[in-house]
Amino acid sequence: MAPTATQDPVAVAVPASKAAKHGYVHPTDMLPSGWPTATDLSGGAQPRRFEGTIFDVMVRGTIPKELYGTFYRIMPDYAEAPTYYKGGELNAPIDGDGTVAAFRFKDGKVDYRQRFVETDRFKVERRARKSMYGLYRNPYTHHPCVRQTVDSTANTNVVMHAGRFLAMKENGNAYELDPHTLQTLGYNPFKLPSKTMTAHPKQCSVTGNLVGFGYEAKGLATKDVYYFEVDPSGKVVHELWLEAPWCAFIHDCALTPNYLVLMLWPFEANLDRMKAGGHHWAYDYDKPITWITIPRGAKSKDQVKCWYWKNGMPIHTASGFEDDQGRIIIDSSLVHGNAFPFFPPDSAEQRQKQQSDGTPKAQFVRWTIDPRNDSNERLPDPEVILDTPSEFPQIDNRFMGVEYSSAFINVFVPDRSDGNKNVFQGLNGLAHYRRKQGTTEWYYAGDNCLIQEPVFSPRSADAPEGDGFVLAIVDRLDLNRSEVVIIDTRDFTTAIAAVQLPFAIRSGIHGQWIPGQVTPDFDSRGLIDLPKQQHWAPPSQSAFDPNM
């Protein structure tokens, strides 16, 4: 007899090795799957692969009328089972096809659209109905017929510049999307000569330029770096070619009025390793964190300087600025070791060190670089701002590149977190750090919840810095669904509204709040077209008779 709502569920006997943590496995879960485990950075292993729309998403609380724009998130999610190379057992969590989630806020309502970025890689595999690509950034593990295609999945970040909405991943150039339908429109819209473009370009609040770089800019495992600035009209106005000290993983950067500062992680790409079927990247405990300072508008690579610190990973920056002494100040997350254990070291000795060290310590810190000093100088130890695992810091982007006060940071909430987890797998809250006041407020997402990178929307165009709303996706692990929480920065500890999706979406890597004012045709177009004011049935077919 099937259990009623008041009865305990009927237990199904399964081998202990296959039992889920809650002790019950549904019979269909015992059937073989063509999908390998495909984890994201948060540790989730379930592909979602959803494309579609939701009109007027269900909301708890009240959406502030001041929210006028779109909250975009981009996520890695495999459109096809990633089994081509070794059954997918070596797949990296940062790989997977880019899929964009868009929450459109207007007049206190929210519509939702989700769609894959139709990259060349996506189109190849969609036509084939199977996986054709192997390891992350290793074409030697791809099917021979696709090795000369651009294998970027455009899954890392989005930005709006010069009226163009871009989806980006650092192993290729950007794809352009329609900001309303999310249809893919083209590749490399600014015609950059580099083979690659960072997923973390910065929009200068002073000049309006999009400032960025590409690394491995002339091909696999090359040390070539390309610096560029694109003005608000879409024209490249500054560019410079330079070389990194080694072929390093250069994910994020910091911007000041006079410098672009690159952060080199201690990984190294090696062509021989790739040809042998190994990973693009290997962590190296003998290499230091390295910073490259590029004077904005520089005409010669001789103007570029390098700086070093200990081993570790400054993963993402909040922002950068210059103090009254001309020193560069950068606030960033910092992991004291390898935060990407899926790219282990080459040597057995270093692999043993990674294993024995366990989960590396993570913090939010402040770096100081004096660009007047000689190149190749070791930096002083950074100042610790938050001594708790911290990642994905964001600011009020109206102050990008200049001195700022407020930072919004993904954190492990003190006393409510498991500090033994990888920094990406225990982020259960947000911190509002007020630099000038020296204070920190905490928002806790709730039990059995993880929270993703925040974004900030100012209360008005002329609102004081940090006065507005923070939005972030909360993964409700207990309910297997996702929701956007909205926090008023005037009372940071409590959400004022939650936009509740009826399902879970993948853990995103990055996202942006794009105001309606800078989105082309924002008022005339929506994420979802409204039905035409034309009825299929004439009034005579209605059951209502106005004469009765």
From Swiss-Prot:
One Gene Ontology molecular-function label: carotenoid dioxygenase activity
Keyword Iron attributed: yes
Protein keywords: Dioxygenase, Iron, Metal-binding, Oxidoreductase
Cofactor binding mode and count: Binds 1 Fe(2+) ion per subunit.
EC number(s) stated in the UniProt entry for this protein: 1.13.11.-
Gene disruption phenotype: Does not affect biotrophic development, nor virulence.
Keyword Iron: yes
GO terms classed as biological process: carotene catabolic process
EC category name: oxidoreductase
Residues holding Fe cation: H200, H251, H316, H510
Catalytic activity: trans-resveratrol + O2 = 3,5-dihydroxybenzaldehyde + 4-hydroxybenzaldehyde; piceatannol + O2 = 3,5-dihydroxybenzaldehyde + 3,4-dihydroxybenzaldehyde
Function: Dioxygenase that cleaves the interphenyl C-alpha-C-beta double bond of resveratrol to yield 3,5-dihydroxybenzaldehyde and 4-hydroxybenzaldehyde. Also cleaves piceatannol, a compound that differs from resveratrol only in the occurrence of an additional hydroxyl group, which leads to the production of 3,4-dihydroxybenzaldehyde and 3,5-hydroxybenzaldehyde. Exhibits a high degree of substrate specificity, as suggested by the lack of activity on carotenoids and the other resveratrol- related compounds.
Protein name: Resveratrol cleavage oxygenase 1
Lineage, opening ranks: Eukaryota, Fungi, Dikarya, Basidiomycota, Ustilaginomycotina
Chain's gene name: RCO1
